């Protein structure tokens, strides 16, 4: 979601989630996701980013605390990209 033009400093919100242990074993662990997404931010020149993490939360559960916090931060303009 790009809310501003290319010249505007970016505050990037990064949401990561794993719902099962099986996913974590297959390389989708929280730490693996963070590592890949941090590398992507660095490759894009984005140095201001925040991770929002929900562990053990199903995608079916719409009440995910970190996702809700990230969405509030977007609404408040704290995060300009996600």
UniProtKB/Swiss-Prot annotation:
InterPro entries membership: Recombinase_CS, Resolv_N, Resolvase-like_N_sf, SSR_resolvase
Keywords: DNA integration, DNA invertase, DNA recombination, DNA-binding
Keyword DNA-binding in annotation: yes
Family: Belongs to the site-specific recombinase resolvase family.
Listed Pfam families: Resolvase
All residue ranges annotated as the Resolvase/invertase-type recombinase catalytic domain in the record: 11-82
Protein name: Uncharacterized immunity region protein 3
Biological processes, Gene Ontology terms: DNA integration
Annotated active site: 19
SUPFAM superfamilies per record: Resolvase-like
An example Gene Ontology molecular-function term: DNA strand exchange activity
Protein's organism: Bacillus phage phi105 (Bacteriophage phi-105)
Annotated PANTHER family: DNA RECOMBINASE-RELATED (PTHR30461:SF23), DNA-INVERTASE FROM LAMBDOID PROPHAGE (PTHR30461)
